[in-house]
Amino acid sequence: MDLPRNPTRAVRIGSVTIGDGNPIAVQSMTATHTQNVDATCEQIRALTAAGADLVRVAVDSRKDAEALAEISRRTGANLSVDLQENYRLAEVVAPHVAKIRYNPGHLYHHERSKRWQEKVKYLAGVAAENDCAMRVGVNCGSVDPAKKEKYDDDDSISPMLESALDHCALLDEIGFTRFCVSLKDSDPRQVIDVNQRFAAERPDVPLHLGVTEAGMPPDGIIKTRIAFEQ
């Protein structure tokens, strides 16, 4: 199928390169307790065999991060990690993954005395030192409060869009270009709208598409297809 695509820049994530006309990469995630190394490795191998180019692993604590090192050694897969609320875990996980995802809204919760710009510069530095790409992962349920309060309660898209654009601008400013962006909502119509608006503003940035809290089949499949096929 010949899909119309924006002329985005190339972003290397481990052995995979996205954007710039490269094949669309598929990412899945494990549903195991990360500290159960055997089960997590088994699931990563199964996902890779099924066609996943990247696999996201949950890391919510330092113990998870320690398990990640062994998981990476055993599988050799292109791993991605979501930092959740503790962005400082980046320096622990970065040596073992191909991509780090951070949520701009979650940066607000940890070390509140620091400006978000300082935190992003730290993340970009860690990523660069460890040959990692990054994903700026904006989510409707956890938008930066400073952005959210600027808009009406019924407008969930504008604060997400502003947040993503601001983070892209900062990463551009400091010269970190190995990043993609995701803008997710549980409503596929909102996903379509916010991603189209972002792509119009930043056609150079590769998109990571997804529907948050999509749910189990068949509902999850239906929501995802609606969002992806527009």
Stretches found by the model and what they are:
Residues A31, N36, A49-T75, P104-R112, ...:
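Glycine-rich, proline-tolerant flexible connector loops at the mouths of alpha/beta enzymes
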Residues G105-T177:
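Conserved anion-binding
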Residues K147-Q230:
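Catalytic alpha/beta core domains of metabolic enzymes, predominantly
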